[in-house]
A protein has these predicted regions:
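Conserved, well-ordered active-site substructure
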Residues: 113-139, 147, 296-368, 373, ...
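Short alpha-helix capping/helix-loop boundary micro-motifs
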Residues: 259-273
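Well-ordered beta-sheet/strand-loop patches within structured domains
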Residues: 235, 243, 252-256, 287, ...
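Short, Lys/Arg- and Gly-enriched loop/turn segments at beta-strand edges
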Residues: 285-298
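Extracellular structured ligand-interaction cores
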Residues: 44, 142, 277, 326, ...
Length: 414
C-alpha cells in the first residue's frame, strides 16, 4: 500500500476508518474487538479490560519458568524452537487451574542466550533484573507495564537497588539472574544474585554457565524474595570460595534460596564477616517513578509513545517511521479501562503501522498512556473462549508462533 500513489495521508481522519468485524465478551470484564481498516489492508485485535472489575487480574510468565532460557537458535528467531510459546504458557497455566482468558507477548529479548532486555517481576518476585550498564545503554527499554498489588497501574521508568545486610553493614548487589554471572564480559559488577530460576541445563544439550572465580554465598529465606517488601531474614547455608581454587558453581532449586556471587574487595570483606549459619537480611527495591509500593506484575516495554494523551515519538526518525506489526498496551485517562491491542503486518493481508499511525489508533481507542512491547514476528495474541484457546491474530513469523521470552496473561479469578 502506498499512501502517495493513492493520494492519501496518514494525517487524514479517513485513513483510520475501520469497521468492527467482531465484538464480544470473552468473560466478565473482558471484551474482544476486531477492527478491519476500510481503505487498506490492516487488522487490529483489541482486548478491553474493565479495571473496576476486581476479578480481572494480570499475571506474567517467563517461558518454562526459567531465566536465562536459551533457545540455541543463533538469534534466527523463527517459529517454535525450544522455549515455550505464548500458547503453551497459557495452556499450561490453565491446566494448573488458572483461568487465563487472554495472553500476549511482551518484552524484547536475546533469543539465542535467552534473556530479556528489561526487568521481569512476577507476583513480586524479581525473576530478572539486568545489570546497570545494560540498563543505561538500553534507553528505549526503560519503561514498562507495572500492576501493583493495590491494582493501580504505572508506565513510569524504574530503578533497582538490591542490598545484603550483615549486621549493620550494607552490601549492594546489582542484578538478578543476569548472564553477568558468567564473569565473561565487561563491565563487571562485584555482587550479583541468582535464584532457582537460573537452571544449569535448561534444555537438553544446552547449559547456563556460571563463572567460578568468585565467592559464592548461599542463603535461604523463610519465604521467597520479593521487591518492595522490606528486608527478608535469611540464613547462610553454604559459602564456596572459588577465587583461589577450582570449584563447581552452585545452583539452587528451592524458591526460598538465592546465591550471591561476589568478587573484588567486597568478596574479601564478606568472607571475613560471614560464616555458615549466620543470619543476614536481604532486600530488593524496584522504584517505579516515585513509587515503592508492592508489585504484582512488571513487564518491560520499548517506547512509551503516548504520554498524558500526547504523542511521544521515538527520537530517531527512521525508528518512528518504520512500519511493523506491534503489541501494545494502554490505559484511558480515567484509568477505568486497559486496552491491549495487536497490530498485524508484514503480510499481504496486513501492512503494519508506524508509531504515529499507532498513536492515531490509540487516540481513536480513547487511550491516554500507551507502551509498545516487542513486535515484528513476535507479535501474538491468544484468547480462550467456549472451551477453546487459540491465537487470534496472524503471526508474521514465516514459521509460525515464536518462542519468545516472556508473556503477559489476563486472568479471571473464580
Amino acid at each position: 500500500f502506498s499512501k502517495e500513489a493513492n493520494n492519501f495521508s496518514n494525517q487524514d481522519e479517513a485513513y483510520y476508518d475501520w469497521q468492527v468485524t467482531e465484538d464480544r465478551e470473552l468473560a466478565s470484564g473482558i471484551v474482544y474487538k476486531h477492527y478491519s481498516f476500510i481503505n487498506f489492508n490492516q487488522n487490529i485485535y483489541a482486548i478491553e479490560i474493565d479495571m473496576n472489575n476486581p476479578k480481572v487480574t494480570f499475571e506474567t510468565v517467563m517461558a518454562d519458568e526459567i531465566c536465562p532460557n536459551p533457545n540455541g537458535n543463533n538469534n534466527s528467531n523463527n517459529g517454535k524452537v525450544l522455549r515455550e510459546t505464548l500458547s503453551e504458557t497459557c495452556t499450561r497455566r490453565r491446566d494448573e487451574g488458572r483461568n487465563i482468558i487472554v495472553g500476549i507477548n511482551t518484552g524484547f529479548f536475546n533469543s539465542h542466550d535467552g534473556f530479556p532486555r528489561g526487568m521481569h517481576i512476577e507476583e513480586g518476585e524479581p525473576v530478572f533484573i539486568n545489570n546497570p550498564y545494560v540498563r543505561s545503554i538500553l534507553t528505549n527499554h526503560v519503561w514498562g507495564f507495572t500492576f501493583f498489588d493495590n491494582r493501580t497501574v504505572s508506565f513510569e521508568k524504574r530503578d533497582f537497588t538490591g542490598k545484603l545486610k550483615v549486621g549493620t553493614k550494607e552490601y549492594e548487589y546489582y542484578s538478578v539472574n543476569d548472564t553477568i554471572v558468567r564473569l565473561s564480559g565487561k563491565p563487571s559488577y562485584d555482587a550479583n544474585l541468582y535464584t532457582f530460576r537460573y537452571v544449569k541445563e535448561p534444555h537438553p544439550g544446552l547449559t547456563n554457565p556460571i563463572g567460578t572465580k568468585a565467592l559464592f554465598i548461599i542463603g535461604k529465606n523463610n519465604q521467597p524474595l520479593k521487591v518492595n517488601s522490606g528486608d527478608f531474614e535469611a540464613t547462610i547455608t553454604k559459602i564456596i570460595d572459588g577465587r583461589g581454587t577450582t570449584v563447581e558453581a552452585p545452583y539452587v532449586t528451592d524458591k526460598n534460596e538465592w546465591v550471591l556471587q561476589v568478587t573484588g574487595d567486597k568478596a574479601d570483606e564478606l568472607v571475613q564477616n560471614l560464616k555458615t549459619g549466620d543470619k543476614v537480611q536481604i532486600s530488593a527495591e524496584l522504584k517505579i517513578g516515585s513509587s515503592t509500593n508492592p508489585i504484582k506484575v512488571h513487564n518491560s516495554s520499548m517506547y512509551r509513545y503516548v504520554y498524558n494523551g500526547v504523542y511521544s515519538a521515538p527520537p530517531k526518525k527512521e525508528d518512528a517511521e518504520t512500519i511493523n506489526p506491534t503489541t501494545n498496551l494502554g490505559m484511558t485517562q480515567d484509568k477505568s479501562k486497559i486496552v491491549i491491542f495487536c497490530v498485524d503486518g508484514r503480510t499481504d493481508s496486513d501492512r503494519g503501522l508506524d508509531f504515529y499511525e499507532a498513536y492515531r489508533v490509540c487516540k481513536k481507542l480513547g487511550l491516554y498512556d500507551v507502551i509498545r512491547f516487542d513486535g515484528g514476528g513476535s507479535t501474538v495474541m491468544w484468547t480462550y473462549e467456549n472451551g477453546i484457546g487459540k491465537v487470534i491474530n496472524h503471526v508474521s513469523d514465516t514459521k509460525g508462533e515464536r518462542s519468545c521470552m516472556n508473556y503477559l496473561h489476563v486472568r479471571v479469578l473464580e
